[in-house]
């Protein structure tokens, strides 16, 4: 009897967008896909598509903001399979209508984009250290390279996501664990569909997922794309701060 353990892959935010596309890419025989998402019906639909590809699938609507729930979810996967890959993909964006709502709005964004990353990644770390193997991917954003006034606090939360992944990469390398920061530009999704401003180099979701999968297979520390957007962000970062500040203040904001 084959005793080869299943390869456990955790993906948050898997009911749509990049998370859903990644789930389909990784689905296959010998894989235990553990998926979370906010929309139960879309999540179950994605789970069935992955099962049709031969994967064993666990799909739950546990919020990434639930510390204990995410800990149980991650450790439960590790009890059923070798924890090979954790992709902290869940994220939210948006805007606020009144300064009276500002505090609640900021905390709502950061609870998902910062606390959600910690609640997904941190329980996996000691498990992977004991295994002496595993890979962690944190989905940040191209917005995580500059402090963008029109994207408060989305930009700063993605700064954290990118920096946390890059710090962990160096710290966990001696433990045999690979870590990558994923920094996409504009990708077709329910989130970007709300944007009312031009989105240069808007990329198809399936193509973005393939770039991410290939970058993770190569153990790239920073998976940033598309390259024209990477070049633009790099050039902006070289500007004197007063000029950069002037330009970023005129960038469109999120609604």
Model-flagged regions — what are they?
Residues 141:
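Residue(s) in the substrate-gating loop at a strand-loop-helix junction
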Residues 121, 157:
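Active-site helix of classical SDR
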Residues 82, 93-107, 150:
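Conserved mid-core segment of classical short-chain dehydrogenase/reductases
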Residues 29-46:
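Conserved glycine-rich Rossmann-like NAD(P)H-binding loop of the short-chain dehydrogenase/reductase
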Residues 50-68:
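Rossmann-fold cofactor-recognition segment
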Residues 181, 197-232:
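C-terminal helical subdomain
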Residues 13-16:
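Conserved glycine-rich cofactor-binding loop
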């Amino acid at each position: 009897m084959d005793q080869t353990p299943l390869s456990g892959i955790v993906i948050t935010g898997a009911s749509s967008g990049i998370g859903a596309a990644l789930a389909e890419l990784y689905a296959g025989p010998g894989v235990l896909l553990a998926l979370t998402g906010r929309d139960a019906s879309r999540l179950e639909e994605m789970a069935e598509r992955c099962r049709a590809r031969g994967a064993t699938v666990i799909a739950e609507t546990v919020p990434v903001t639930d510390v204990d729930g995410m800990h149980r979810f991650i450790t439960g996967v590790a009890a059923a399979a070798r924890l090979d890959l954790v992709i902290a993909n869940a994220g939210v964006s948006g805007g606020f209508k009144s300064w009276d709502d500002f505090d609640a709005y900021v905390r709502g964004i950061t609870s998902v984009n910062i606390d959600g990353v910690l609640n997904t990644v941190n329980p996996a770390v000691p498990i992977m250290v004991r295994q002496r193997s595993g890979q962690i991917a944190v989905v940040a954003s191209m917005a995580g390279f500059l402090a963008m006034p029109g994207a408060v606090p989305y930009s700063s939360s993605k700064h954290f996501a990118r920096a946390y992944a890059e710090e962990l990469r160096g710290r966990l390398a001696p433990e045999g664990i690979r870590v990558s920061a994923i920094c996409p530009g504009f990708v077709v999704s329910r989130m970007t569909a709300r944007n009312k401003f031009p989105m240069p180099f808007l990329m198809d979701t399936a193509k973005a997922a393939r770039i991410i999968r290939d970058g993770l297979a190569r153990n790239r520390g920073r998976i940033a794309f598309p390259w024209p957007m990477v070049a633009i962000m790099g050039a902006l970062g070289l500007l004197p701060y007063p000029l950069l500040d002037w330009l970023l203040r005129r960038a469109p904001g999120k609604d």
